[in-house]
Amino acid sequence: MKHSKLLICFSLLAGILFLIVCCMYAHPLKKSTVIPDFSLADDTISASSDTPKQLSLFASGACLMDVESGRILYGKEEQTPRPMASTTKIMTCLLALEQSSPSEEVSFSSRAVSMPKVHLGASKGSSFTMNDLLHSLMLESHNDTAVAVAEHVGGSVEGFADKMNQKAAELGLNATHFVTPNGLDADGHQSTPADMCRLASYACQNKDFLKIIQTPSKTISDKKGHSYSLTNHDAFLTSYSGALGIKTGFTGKAGYCFVGAAKRENLTLTSCVLASGWPPDKSRKWVDTKALMDYGFTHFKKQKISFQDFSKTPLRVADGIENQVFLRVPEPITLPLASFETLEIHYLLPASVTAPVSTSDPVGTIECRINGSVYNSYPVYPSASVDKITFSHILYEVIDEFLSLFCKK
């Protein structure tokens, strides 16, 4: 009798172990449909016209960028660092707007009043509101004003330069380095046309910045009542349809420079030309800027790109408590595309995945290529998490299966 009980127990134990092993290799116990390999065909929007000729620009470095997407639409040595003269004041103005209030009083130090022309000409100790000085900075490009603003916001010119470089890093201006707040020539003070377009794109989002740079003229006064007349010297603002303005620049080392912005319908563009001639060729920067903007508005149109809806097609999961998972489709994107460009969308998704699966971990990517070059990639995430199958989970299912069989009897 004793041996019979042991034999029965051993048989039951062996049966349970056998079921567990079976479950480990053939989970789940319950019947499920076979999940096929996940696959999607690529999408293509083909070019419908020939590529236009390269622009003939005076500038040594130039860039044209779409503000919304950050896509570079045209470039000429756009990644090459060069001195950028008073276009530096774009960053000076933005930092002052973000880190001070318009009504704050700003005084001129001995360092500020020592700056060379172009300058406001205020005397040491003179005080103005921050708002008035930012108009002096951007309309007349006053070098002494830039130092006064920098010392007020940063504690010193050097401290303000640190803030400028921190902001540049935040904005991804990786080839940009600031030394001065006014853009006067200094060793290591440089940027690229692409970085300056990114900075201008960021500036276009600041309504106070746009209001300042679009002011035609303004009279300001110090606290003692001395008045100063300011006139906007941005000829682009009044000569180009849709122009938003932004900032001119010139030094002996940088040459004539201009960073501009313009908007027509739903397309907003920023441009940058560096070293666009030296005296007496002051107008070349305007010729270059018009050529860049015309190129952008003539050839590029915004297009909404939607990805294939694969949200209802399951992706097979191996070694998981579930044998499938559904995927989330990324939101549509909007891109400026020209008729001479070909857009390809490649779905780089696996045939299956192995558990554990988390909603925060991408399982694949969607790659957008323009004219064969990768423009950007977008991660694809699962819509639910799937835990990895474990011994305890299998044991629970075995017991549940036994109980269900027992209850049926």
Describe the function of each predicted region.
Residues K2-H3, S11, N165-A168:
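Periplasmic/cell-envelope proteins involved in peptidoglycan metabolism and beta-lactam response
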Residues H3-L6, M130, F391, L395:
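Structural motif marking the loop-to-transmembrane transition
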Residues K5-H27:
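Sec-dependent N-terminal signal peptides of Gram-positive bacterial secreted proteins and lipoproteins
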Residues C22-L40, L327-E341:
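Short, compositionally biased leader-like segments
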Residues A26-K207, D222-K223:
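Active-site-adjacent loops and short helices of periplasmic peptidoglycan-processing enzymes
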Residues N174, D185-Q190, A194-D195, A200-K409:
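Domain-terminus/edge residues, biased toward the C-terminal soluble/receptor-binding domains
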